Amino acid sequence: MIINSRLMFRLKYLNILGSKAELAALPEGKLLINTINAHSYNTARKDELFAEALTNGDVLIPDGVSIVKACRWIKAKRLPKERIAGWDLFEFEMNKLEECGMKNVECGVNGEECGMNNSSLDNSRSASADNSCSGKRLYEPSAKLKTQNSKLRSSQRTVMFMGSSEKVLDLIVKRAAEVYPHLKVVTYSPPYKPEFSDEDNKAIIDAINAVNPDLLWIGMTAPKQEKWTYSHWNELNIHCHVGTIGAVFDFFAGTVERAPIWWQRHGLEWLYRLLKEPKRMWRRYIIGNTLFLWNMVKEKC
């Protein structure tokens, strides 16, 4: 179903993923995976293109306890069983690709298909970084990469991070090298501006297509990242899962602290962020959560 107006955007009609088990069962190939929470719902009610992007992507993940509870209360089309945070998506996909990279190295076969299992959801392995690209050009592989064993190099799987700043991407590369040693990490930092020019868009698309990654993360904050990916989806000649997870870039890089486990388990991650950054977050969570509740009352009726 194609949404042509933000006025048609309703939580009760969205095809939201139900569980982590469903996440593990997603098919391989080119898939656009977005997340939805109370804030993105409110934004989509005012932004037609964002509403289209969330509705017409391949997978929509409930990144918020409020979404899970609201779906049950309004008796939505899909009733998700649990929250799946953007971080959960990130860890699952990265662990899966890392496992595949390990198997390829063990077998010494380039491009061998790997079987995955649900245990990847609970593993905490992470990824490596061997080359990066930023701005408008792809950088050449480092000397260290060039001298690696050819079998290992050819069997590596590639993950690409598109978005954020050079500083954050450098931190991502360093951490990935420690926790995902069987993956090759490529990064691209787009220009920092509200709207990209045609030249900017072409440079980004060309960079992604040149890398042709096995996994692509887009991190430009919502709704920009979802709208950009949706608008240029047909121009991306790639074969992999694509996730729009802006905040996760900062979490993984360590530039933003994620809420402790207790807060996460009790669905209070939003409150932790509000207490940490009240000046920046009060409007989003105090006014935004109230607006979300009011919209749910209207959907219920």
Q: Could you describe each region identified by the protein language model?
A:
Residues 1-91:
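N-terminal nucleotide/polyanion-binding subdomain common to many enzyme families
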Residues 1-2, 97-126, 131-136, 140-156, ...:
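Short, basic, low-complexity termini and linkers enriched in Ser/Thr/Gly/Pro
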Residues 30, 157, 237-241:
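A short helix->loop->beta-strand "cap" motif at the edges of active sites that frequently abuts
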Residues 38-41, 220-225, 248:
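Short glycine-rich anion-binding loops that position phosphate/pyrophosphate groups of nucleotides
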Residues 190-196, 238-276:
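Short, flexible loop segments at boundaries between secondary-structure elements
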Residues 205-222, 229:
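Proline-aspartate-enriched helix->loop->beta-strand connector
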